[in-house]
Amino acid sequence: MRLMRTPLIATAVAIAIATTLTGVAVAARVLNVRDEGHLRFVTSDGSELIDEGPATGTVPGKVRVHFVYDGEPAVSARFTIYGHGGSISGKAKGRLSNPTSPDPSFRGAFQITGGSGSYIHIHGTGELFGVFDRRGSNKYGLVVQTIGKLPY
């Protein structure tokens, strides 16, 4: 009986190791994001400003941001980055450092809400930094930096 158990135990161990190694082989990749966008004003709808521009860094491409500013220190945004391998969408919340300044800086967090192409399974969170530039009536701009680790 003892001899019969040894092959069964060895088989069970081999299956466990194979299953573990298979899990490692298909583990998610992680995108260490460090991107920057210099965006220009496109249009507005009430307190929502829509800006677009180039993004450089880990996921270079074009960025479109729906930035919500209502005069309060709290700001929010929805964004999509259109890169070569697909798109990444998310949302963000932050606080302006000095809301009365013509170019207040802000800091907050972003959360990925979806992706396409190579980024279809992307998710995660990160930090957001930037400057909201108010250059006059309907002349707004954003400089935004993001840092995060995003599994995909």
PLM segments and residue spans:
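Bacterial N-terminal signal peptides that target proteins for export
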Residues: M1-T11
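Beta-strand-enriched cores of mature, soluble protein domains
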Residues: V26-Y152
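Bacterial N-terminal signal peptides
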Residues: T11-T20
